[in-house]
């Protein structure tokens, strides 16, 4: 970060602290993800408030904006004027230091994610940074706090205002990059394995896309339970890393039928199938289950076959979508579950309880987010390509500046 921007940020924090909660505007949930326009209004504007003078010389704030559905070029780097933070009641404003890239962001770019607000919109479901201002009624956060954020969208920008209830204090030893890699992947993996899967000693688990963000989180969480057998699918070049991280039986899905391979090793199947793929793979996972086993589907990665929406892939995935009757479940003693973190944004206590457990596991040294790569906003297309082409091992991150901030 340049000395000029550091000075500007310090001035912004000072101005926000003096202004306090009285500067709130009461923006709604979707407001943080909609970057303000930079055009000058035709009507005369009132003179700036005294507190605005501290940031009058601040450089514009940069944000990534999804301008249309399609390929990598649809996410553009734009800027907006730097104005004094004005969080509304129950909100806070933070300077973003790192943000996570998830499959939902890739699907959103192609128009396949229904939780994305209308375009143009700043994507990004998670991030981490420093609080610069708090709104009325926020008593458990203050300027200077380091927080990680889980939000519907809007995190891919230098400064963002979010509901305080969707922020979590970072452990002292955690870096901003680790914090930006924790929430989506580890909440998903934890709830799939423990809340739905009821993972216990002696169980066996199939982890698809085991080298991805959720996959690596799941491997670490499986190691917190004794004697868990893990089958992990990934390309052959990633198998050594998978073995080092607890995969008992890595499977190259490019060259091997994972169903046949698992049946050879474990004829009765597995106890838990983590399914981020959808389509025909959900059915395969169901038929791999032991009695009392569970398949938990939490994604539709099979929809993504390239940088742009593929109608044939969509038709194939939906045509092969798995269905089962209650009678069939009863007779097989199996369960099919669905998980979508985006639809738990109203379940504050539930999510908080999971984050509390994850932070405890981090502090105890049991989990630690694996970072694949860190990309500046200018290279967002390269970051998305890295993930879309499944070249990553662990989490892909974005940072506002050209240098990594910790």
UniProtKB/Swiss-Prot annotation:
Membrane topology: Peripheral membrane protein
Free-text function comment from the UniProt entry: Plays a part in calcium-regulated keratinocyte activation in epidermal repair mechanisms. Has no effect on cell proliferation. Possesses ATPase activity. Negatively regulates mitochondrial fusion in cooperation with mitofusin proteins (MFN1-2).
GO process annotations (BP): negative regulation of mitochondrial fusion
Record family assignment: Belongs to the zinc-containing alcohol dehydrogenase family. Quinone oxidoreductase subfamily.
Keyword Mitochondrion: yes
Keywords: Acetylation, Cytoplasm, Membrane, Mitochondrion, Mitochondrion outer membrane, Oxidoreductase, Phosphoprotein
Protein name: Synaptic vesicle membrane protein VAT-1 homolog
KW Translocase (keyword) present: no
Start-end of Low complexity biased regions: 9-22
Example of a GO MF term: oxidoreductase activity
Entry-annotated residues carrying Phosphoserine: 2, 33, 42
Modified residues (N-acetylserine): 2
Location of the protein in the cell: Cytoplasm; Mitochondrion outer membrane
Region annotated Disordered, chain positions: 1-57
GO cellular component: mitochondrial outer membrane
UniProt-listed Pfam families: ADH_N (PF08240), ADH_zinc_N_2 (PF13602)
Annotated EC: 1.-.-.-
Annotated SMART domains: PKS_ER
Listed InterPro entries: ADH-like_N, GroES-like_sf, NAD(P)-bd_dom_sf, PKS_ER, Quin_OxRdtase/zeta-crystal_CS, SV-ATPase_mito-regulator
């Amino acid at each position: 970060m340049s000395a000029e921007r550091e000075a500007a940020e310090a001035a912004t924090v000072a101005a926000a602290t003096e202004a306090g909660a009285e500067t709130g505007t009461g923006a709604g949930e979707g407001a943080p993800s909609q970057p303000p326009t930079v055009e000058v209004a035709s009507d005369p504007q009132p003179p700036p408030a005294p507190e605005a003078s501290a940031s009058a010389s601040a450089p514009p704030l940069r944000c990534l904006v999804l301008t249309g559905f399609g390929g990598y070029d649809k996410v553009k780097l734009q800027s907006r004027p730097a104005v004094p933070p004005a969080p509304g009641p129950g909100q806070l404003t933070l300077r973003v230091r790192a943000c996570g890239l998830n499959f939902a962001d890739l699907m959103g770019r192609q128009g396949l994610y229904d939780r994305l607000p209308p375009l143009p919109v700043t994507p990004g479901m998670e991030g981490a940074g420093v609080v610069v201002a708090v709104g009325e009624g926020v008593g458990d956060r203050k300027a200077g706090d380091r927080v990680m954020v889980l939000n519907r969208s809007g995190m891919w920008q230098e400064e963002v205002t979010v509901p305080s209830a969707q922020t979590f204090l970072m452990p002292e030893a955690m870096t901003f990059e680790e914090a930006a890699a924790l929430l989506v992947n580890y909440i998903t993996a934890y709830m799939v394995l423990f809340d739905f899967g009821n993972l216990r000693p002696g169980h066996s688990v199939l982890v698809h896309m085991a080298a991805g963000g959720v996959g690596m989180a799941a491997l670490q969480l499986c190691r917190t339970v004794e004697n868990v057998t893990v089958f992990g699918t990934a390309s052959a070049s990633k198998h050594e890393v998978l073995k080092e991280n607890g995969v008992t039986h890595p499977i190259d899905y490019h060259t091997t039928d994972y169903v046949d391979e698992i049946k050879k090793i474990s004829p009765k199947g597995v106890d838990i199938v983590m399914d981020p793929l959808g389509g025909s793979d959900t059915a395969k996972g169901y038929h791999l289950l032991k009695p009392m086993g569970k398949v938990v589907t939490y994604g539709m990665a099979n929809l993504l076959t390239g940088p742009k929406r593929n109608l044939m892939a969509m038709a194939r995935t939906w045509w092969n979508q798995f269905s089962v009757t209650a009678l069939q479940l009863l007779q097989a003693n199996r369960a099919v579950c669905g998980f979508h973190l985006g639809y738990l944004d109203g379940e504050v206590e539930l999510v908080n309880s999971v984050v509390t457990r994850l932070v405890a596991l981090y502090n105890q040294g049991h989990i630690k987010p694996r970072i694949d790569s860190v990309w500046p906003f200018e290279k967002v297309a390269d970051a998305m390509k890295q993930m879309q082409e499944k070249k990553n091992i662990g989490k892909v991150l974005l940072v506002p500046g050209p240098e990594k901030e910790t």
